[in-house]
Every structure is written in C-alpha cells, then in structure tokens.
Amino acid sequence: MQNYKDLKVWEKSHQFALEIYRVTEGFPRQEMYGLTNQLRRAASSIAANIAEGCGRKTKPDFANFLNISLGSSNEAEYFVLLARDLK
C-alpha cells in the first residue's frame, strides 16, 4: 500500500480534524466531555482510519478501513449539525 500522507483524501481529512479542534476550543466548558469530545473523536477518526488502512496488506482490508472512515465522516457531520442547531 502507499504512504497515507500522499493521499489527497487523508490530507483533507487531517485538515478537517485540525479545524474541528480549533472550532471546538470555543465550545462551552460543560461540553468538554460531551459534544466537544464526540466531535473531536469522530473528526480525528476519519484520517486515522485512512492511515491505518494504508498499513494493511490487502486491498479488501484497505477498503474496509475506508468504509469505517466514511462512517466516522457521517458521524462528524451529524455532530457539526447538532452543534449548529444548539446555538
């Protein structure tokens, strides 16, 4: 498998995670272990699963981790929508 850092999708998901960390710094303190934590974990999981998949030996294993990454992306999207609607 190739180096995950060479993948455009990994770079974009890494940037997304960094932005989520920046944005959630402004979330209320009482959300530190709630929405803030869940959103950060989902966002960082996207790039992490792409990286882990690149370390696997077979294409089906890699595809499985991309699928998990997609699930994390959907989860992060929901938490962004929730944060928006709670304002």
Predicted regions, residues:
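Amphipathic alpha-helical assembly/interaction segments
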Residues: 1-87
